[in-house]
Amino acid sequence: MNPTTMKAAVLDRRGAEGLSVRDFPRPEPLPDEALLRVHAAGLNRVNLYMRDSGAGITHQLPLVQGVEAAGTVAHAPAGSGLRVGQKAILFSSAFCGRCRYCLQGDQTLCLHASIMGEHRHGTFAEFIAMPAVCFVPLPDDADLVAAGALMVGHLTAWRMLFGKRALRAGETVLIVGIGSGVAVACLQLALKAGARAIVTSSSDTKISRALALGAEAGINYRNERVSERVLALTGGEGVDMVLESSGEKSWAESLRSLRRGGRLVTCGATTGSNPGADLQRVFIRQLEIYGSTGGSLAEFHALIALFARGGIAP
C-alpha cells in the first residue's frame, strides 16, 4: 500500500462519465487539522448538483465528492482533545471563526466557509482532513454507518424544526414531499418533539412508510388538494408549521395550509425557485417565512448527543 495515495471518488469533469474511483493523493493535515479514516459516507442530492453542474459553487476540478462522513481519527493535532482511533463524525463546513456570523455562533453564514465536497475535497475517500474543531467524538459503541448519514439530512431537519421559532409539543406540522432524506428526518424529529405530523407525497408507498413511522395522516397530492385535506384534518384552522423543500409546485398549497400566524420553513427548491409570493395572504394572515440551510456547530452537537443516546437514527 502506498502511504501517499488513497482510493477516492473523484470528479474530473462534469457528468456521470467524469466521476471515477481512482488513486488520489492522501491529504496531509495542516497544523490545526485532524485526519479521519472514513468508515461511512452518506449520499445526497448535492452530490448530483456538483457532478452535473457545480451549482454555481466556487470550486476546482478534480474534486473528491461527498459532504458527510463518520469514521475513526487517524491523526490528531496536539491540544485538540481528539485521540487516534477514536470514533468521530464530521461537521461538513470548515469555518473561519472570526467573522460576525461565526462570533454569533452561526457557522452556516460564515463569510469564508469551505464545505466538504463543494469548495474542498469531500468524504468519498479513504481519508479526509478537516479542522479539528469540525470533529465531533462519538461513543465507542456508535454505529458508524448510521452516523455517516446523519450530518446533512438530520442537521438540516434539526434547524428547520428548532431554529428560528421552534416547533413545540402539541403543534401540527405539514412535511411536504416525504420521500427525501431531509423530510424523513423532519418526521422523526417532529414526533420526538411531541408534535403531530401530516405528510405529502405522490407515492402511496412513501405515505404508508411515513404512517408506519408515526405520521398522523398522508396526502397524495396527485389525488387530492393538499390545503383542503389539511383544513379538514385540523378543524378548518390549518397547521402551525410547514416544512418545504419543493418550491414552485407546492408553494401555493403550502401557504394555504398554514393557520393564521403560522410559519413556513424552506430548505430547498427542487421544482423551481420562483413561486408566486401570494403576499396578500402572507401579510393579512401574518404568516412567517424562514429560509434554512444546514445547522450550526452547537446544533450539530445537540443532534449528536440525541443520536448517542439512541434517540434518533437515519
Spans of features found by a protein language model:
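Phosphate-coordination loops involved in phosphoryl transfer and adenosine-cofactor binding
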Residues: 5, 169-171, 239, 261
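Glycine-rich beta-strand-centered segment in the early N-terminal region that forms part
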Residues: 25-41, 54-103, 134, 139-141
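N-terminal Rossmann-like NAD(P) cofactor-binding module of classical short-chain dehydrogenase/reductase
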Residues: 89, 242-243
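NAD(P)H dinucleotide-binding glycine-rich loop of Rossmann-like/cofactor-binding domains
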Residues: 94-177
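Mid-domain Rossmann-like dinucleotide-binding core that forms the NAD(H)/NADP(H) cofactor-binding site
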Residues: 142-224
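Glycine-rich phosphate-binding loop and adjacent beta-alpha segment
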Residues: 193, 201, 245-313
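Short amphipathic alpha-helix with an adjacent loop that forms part of the alpha/beta core around
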Residues: 225-236
